[in-house]
Amino acid sequence: IVFYTFMGGFLAVAWTDFVQGWIMLITLVVLPLVTLSVLGGWEGMTETIANQTSNNQAALLLNPTGGRTGWTLLAGILGGFGVGFGYAGQPHLLARYMSIRSVGDITKSRSIAISWAVLAYGGAVLMGIVALAYFGPNYFTDPELMMPELAKRMFPSWFAGILICGALAAMMSTADSQLLVTTSSISEDVYHQSINPEAKQADLVKLSRIVTLIIGVVAIFL
């Protein structure tokens, strides 16, 4: 992560995030849909869950509101919107929108972002439900092992390895973005804007690379 951010800057991070985003999307969409098919579709999955849990638990799990009503439901909805506002305000995400080529591309970018989020987060929820049906409620002591184990059960080893890399891709895409934003904050916001407004672009690039390397090394040791 430090190497390609150091060498390529924003362009390298953008291209690697593009590839990583596709890996995550394929993992979160293909894996739960294949598992759902193995379980016999939606009806087969719900029947399996009902057999493994009490009727009340199964009803709550498959209920879009989770059994919440009234103020509890409203608080959950408002909390979800609150998370959405916070998500859109994260610096490493705003940097992506600030780099859009033109105002006309914002609409296209918005559609892509919303479509990706709906598919990815919807797939993540579905993956949890189908994993519960496939493995049972008490199979894992650590729920984070669910996705790798499900991938190994559903696909050949080589393809399962690619899907398991989806988790690594998620970590890398966040880490390189945070690294890039921190670097730009120090080199541009602090040094260029406050310390040396007359700094040349070549000097700023050198400083950015040095800061990237320092932050990466510190992060590794921490």
Describe each PLM feature range.
Residues F159-H192:
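Membrane-helix boundary/coupling elements in multi-pass transport proteins
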Residues W15-F18, S99, K108-S115, I164-A167, ...:
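Internal alpha-helical transmembrane segments of multi-pass membrane proteins, especially GPCRs
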Residues T5-L11, G41, M127-V130, Y134-N138, ...:
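Transmembrane helix-loop junctions in multi-pass membrane proteins
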Residues W22-G161:
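Loop-to-helix junctions at membrane interfaces in multi-pass transport proteins
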Residues I1-V2, Q20-M24, L28-L31, I114-A117, ...:
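Residue-level recognition of pore/gate-forming positions within transmembrane alpha-helices
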Residues I1-T5, G79-G86, L168-D176, S208:
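Helix-loop-helix module between adjacent transmembrane segments
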Residues S187-L222:
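Loop-to-transmembrane helix boundary motifs in multi-pass membrane proteins
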Residues I1-G21, R96-S102:
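Membrane-water interface regions at transmembrane-helix termini and the short interhelical loops
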